[in-house]
């Protein structure tokens, strides 16, 4: 669970919540084969009921700083819809302990779990990342998550990948919901040809320049090196175009590039 045990003292990570949203039985696992009950057992927690299960969450979140984890990540777009509005606690309870709950029970279970985690994250000022766009494509557009974001105004949401192909929808939400930040991760790799236009739109729409940042989403060092080189070039080309057209000055472009590439993420995750 502690990334520094594997990679060294300069690293921090986020805690992926998928297995918790799918943790109705010992047999249930997320798409990476992670088991919630096995993970909780490693932390010394053995819930016997669904209510016990929910009561483990504050303890899990309170342990994150000691494990050098700086946020939560919801990548459930690979497992299910990103709509989390079925907050039926009784239906969620009925999923507990079943090897194969009904689709309605599974959704209610996950909805209650994710909503609870979002609330707890907001109370602790823990950022909450969400993968949007690709995955199970029919349920991964940004507006599917609007209810979750509205119910948790204290939670800082980082919505990833520019929600490609729904980038304009995502930017519209970020204009309305001031607890949304934008992660450009992977979006320029998916479509380098259209990325400059989407970046320009983000610059136009976002309420302030602190709300956009960058990640890599790569497996290997060589891939990360190539990806960061590509996005630096695309950002420079886009900002140079803004300067030529008189949208802002060269020093403004220089400041914005630093914020996108480093400063905004450091501030968002409260990094030193």
Features from the language model and the residues they span:
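Short catalytic/ligand-binding loop motif for oxyanion handling, primarily in non-cytosolic enzymes
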Residues: 2-6, 21-24, 79-83, 136-137, ...
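Histidine/acidic residue-rich metal-binding segments in metalloenzymes
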Residues: 49-73, 81-180, 194-213, 231, ...
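Mid-to-C-terminal alpha-helical segments outside catalytic/metal-binding sites
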Residues: 208-210, 225-272
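Divalent metal-dependent hydrolysis catalytic cores, especially in the metallo-beta-lactamase
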Residues: 1-20, 70-77
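Active-site gating loops and adjacent loop-to-helix segments of metal-dependent hydrolytic enzymes
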Residues: 11-44, 83-104, 234-238
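A generic structural motif
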Residues: 14-18, 184-188, 210-216, 249-255
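Active-site beta-loop-alpha junctions enriched in small/polar residues
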Residues: 16-22, 75-79, 133-135, 162-165, ...
